[in-house]
């Protein structure tokens, strides 16, 4: 049994039974083909145990087991925890817990989850704040999957972690693949920790301040936005060098652009300002931003209110 599974094998089930699917915000994946596809994506990565967040009735769990993957299945509903324990007597460690509070543990692993649509953003923030997972395969709302993968424009949350993570959109999942049927389709999103980060971990705080400044700064287009913080000649030279349209928006930048822009800020001696303040750079003075999620790669996320699992 793997370390991550041994660590949580004895979970308490004394918590009273909570409500049904609606109360937990659950839409269970019932399409076996999609479950198999998720297991295939995980199997194609490095060999690590799998932590499944919100195992529900075990549809994805079953596909992971069929792919010979060691699984720790986390579920909030005690009734479903007991059902999972009966169904998977061997090969799966079933844990009762909340995915927004669960300690992932200091062991290399992959993460799989059909994320309850109502807690997608909190879960992504928490996930980015955990250090030891390698690949996360998540089933989220279709539009969220597209935005996080930078299709049609990148969100601030993705840009804030892009130098350290890669985001890939795998495929669209019809809403009829869920029970009960939600109002929107889902999408399989893969997040992988970069083996060679574009920036050092020590840059996290200042880099995230930069991302916030650029996304929320005044001006129309990147040229105008960046000139509020950098000399015009430096801005023009950077735009030409990176082949970025001066009228482009922050959402149009790619991971390499963001890393290059951060280096430019450091080179010209301008430190991105924490929330609402403008300060000059001091050698070695970097720290995690307290206002922009994720909160950094070196520390965990803030405590979250208790919400349901899903599968």
From Swiss-Prot:
Skewed-composition ranges (Low complexity): 293-302
GO function terms (MF aspect): RNA binding; rRNA (adenine-N6,N6-)-dimethyltransferase activity
Membrane-spanning parts: none
Binding site for S-adenosyl-L-methionine: 27, 29, 54, 75, 98
Cellular component GO terms, alphabetical: cytosol
UniProt keyword terms in alphabetical order: Antibiotic resistance, Methyltransferase, RNA-binding, S-adenosyl-L-methionine, Transferase
One of the GO biological process terms: response to antibiotic
Domain of life: Bacteria
PROSITE patterns (alphabetical): RRNA_A_DIMETH, SAM_RNA_A_N6_MT
Keyword Acetylation: no
Record InterPro entries: KsgA/Erm, rRNA_Ade_Mease_Trfase_CS, rRNA_Ade_methylase_Trfase_N, SAM-dependent_MTases_sf
EC number annotated for this UniProt entry: 2.1.1.-
Keyword Methyltransferase annotated: yes
Region listing for Disordered, in residue ranges: 272-311
Chain's role: Confers resistance to macrolide, lincosamide and streptogramin B antibiotics.
Family: Belongs to the class I-like SAM-binding methyltransferase superfamily. rRNA adenine N(6)-methyltransferase family.
Protein name (database record): Mycinamicin-resistance protein MyrB
Species, as recorded: Micromonospora griseorubida
Lineage: Bacteria, Bacillati, Actinomycetota, Actinomycetes, Micromonosporales
UniProt gene name: myrB
């Amino acid at each position: 049994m793997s370390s991550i599974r041994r660590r949580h094998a004895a979970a308490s089930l004394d918590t009273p039974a909570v409500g049904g699917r609606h109360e937990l915000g659950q839409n269970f994946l019932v399409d076996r083909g999609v479950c198999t596809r998720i297991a295939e994506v995980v199997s194609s990565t490095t060999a690590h145990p799998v932590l499944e967040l919100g195992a529900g009735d075990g549809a994805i769990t079953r596909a992971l087991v069929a792919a010979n993957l060691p699984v720790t299945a986390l579920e909030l509903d005690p009734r479903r925890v007991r059902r999972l324990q009966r169904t998977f007597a061997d090969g799966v460690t079933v844990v009762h817990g909340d995915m927004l509070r669960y300690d992932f543990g200091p062991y290399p692993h992959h993460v799989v989850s059909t994320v309850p649509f109502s807690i997608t953003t909190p879960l992504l923030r928490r996930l980015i704040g955990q250090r030891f997972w390698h690949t996360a395969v998540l089933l989220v709302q279709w539009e969220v999957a597209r935005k996080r993968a930078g299709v049609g424009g990148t969100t601030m949350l993705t840009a804030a972690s892009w130098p350290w993570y890669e985001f890939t959109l795998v495929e669209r999942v019809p809403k009829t693949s869920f029970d009960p049927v939600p109002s929107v389709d889902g999408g399989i999103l893969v997040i992988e920790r970069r083996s060679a980060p574009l920036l050092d971990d020590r840059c996290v705080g200042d880099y995230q301040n930069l991302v916030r400044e650029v996304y929320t700064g005044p001006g129309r287009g990147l040229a105008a936005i960046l000139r509020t913080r950098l000399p015009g000649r430096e801005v023009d030279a950077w735009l030409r060098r990176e082949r970025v349209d001066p009228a482009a928006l922050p959402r149009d930048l790619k991971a390499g652009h963001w890393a290059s822009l951060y280096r430019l800020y450091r080179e010209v001696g301008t430190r991105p300002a924490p929330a609402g303040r403008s300060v000059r750079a001091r050698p070695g003075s970097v720290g995690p931003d307290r206002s922009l999620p994720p909160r950094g790669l070196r520390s965990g996320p803030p405590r979250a209110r208790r919400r349901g699992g899903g599968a």
